[in-house]
């Protein structure tokens, strides 16, 4: 068991080093996926021996270990193949070759520089869905790896694979899921594509109009789409979105009374007129809460950065447990579309926080925001 623990530690140290180095070379990402593969092999072997924990890490079931190892092998082999081409000299981030990107449509391809477009179903702006158009798609075909752009037309989003169009998003299928009338509009920056009548009423195989192809320029900044009249806009529009039913019953008066009383009780416990209120993370105002006649505030540090780097830092912080009281898991704000996440570190006093910041090495790519919180469980 000790041998397995040592091998697991070695694999995880290598993985963390790859996160911290933030390399843009394919050969370094091959090393990362080899380490992930070996990590899951060690966990698989441990589970075979009925070991459910290696030190503090829970060992997943055999099926999970096997599935993760297979994904690591698949991506590692694809990268080793791509490394033999002229594309190896390009910049490749760990995000470009991560598992999520590999399984994002079009699957089993590498992709770069995605830009979002909007598709309005039934001509309604409030019934819209976002899709990604990739500036470059790298696929392995009959002649090895090829780099092509993805393209938008009224049928969907596609790329050309060995001379054939491969649609990885079909707007006709999406209209069945999200709309009622089978019509849609595609909005890309200040350009729009409208669905012909023949497409909205028949399957794509029966369509023979002149194709209007727009190759989306992914370097353009996204602008507000222009207002336009959709195909079939004069038809009666449905008032509800698919899968949602309007609420027709009035809330129980007893529940309403209870909710009002609870809100009033909470408002009485929070003193919003206190002059010590501060501006906190995300632009919200932090209020000092009065508890037993005094203000109980706890010093904290919010760390902002890419999720993998934050997880790496949190792992490293376990060596300095004496310098903080608690540390959160990785989280993000739900009302923003950003790739950054946060972790929060709680301290018993200002001195402990200062010691933490002096001792723990925090990478420059992670932003440090200091503040205070109330009502924190110590």
UniProtKB/Swiss-Prot annotation:
Cross-link Glycyl lysine isopeptide (Lys-Gly) (interchain with G-Cter in SUMO): which residues? 304
**Disordered: annotated span:** 221-281
What's a single GO CC term here?
A: host cell nucleus
Q: Which Gene3D superfamilies does the annotation name?
A: 3.30.70.330, E2 (early) protein, N terminal domain, subdomain 1, Papillomavirus E2 early protein domain
Q: Where is this region: Transactivation domain?
A: 1-200
Molecular functions per Gene Ontology: DNA binding; DNA-binding transcription factor activity; nucleotide binding
Biological role = Plays a role in the initiation of viral DNA replication. A dimer of E2 interacts with a dimer of E1 in order to improve specificity of E1 DNA binding activity. Once the complex recognizes and binds DNA at specific sites, the E2 dimer is removed from DNA. E2 also regulates viral transcription through binding to the E2RE response element (5'-ACCNNNNNNGGT-3') present in multiple copies in the regulatory regions of the viral genome. Activates or represses transcription depending on E2RE's position with regards to proximal promoter elements including the TATA-box.
The protein's assembly and partners: Binds DNA as homodimer. Interacts with protein E1; this interaction greatly increases E1 DNA-binding activity. Interacts with protein L1; this interaction enhances E2-dependent replication and transcription activation. Interacts with protein L2; this interaction inhibits E2 transcriptional activity but not DNA replication function E2. Interacts with protein E7; this interaction inhibits E7 oncogenic activity. Interacts with host TAF1; this interaction modulates E2-dependent transcriptional regulation. Interacts with host BRD4; this interaction mediates E2 transcriptional activation function.
Q: What is this protein called?
A: Regulatory protein E2
| Protein source organism | Human papillomavirus 30
Which gene holds the coding sequence for this protein? Answer: E2
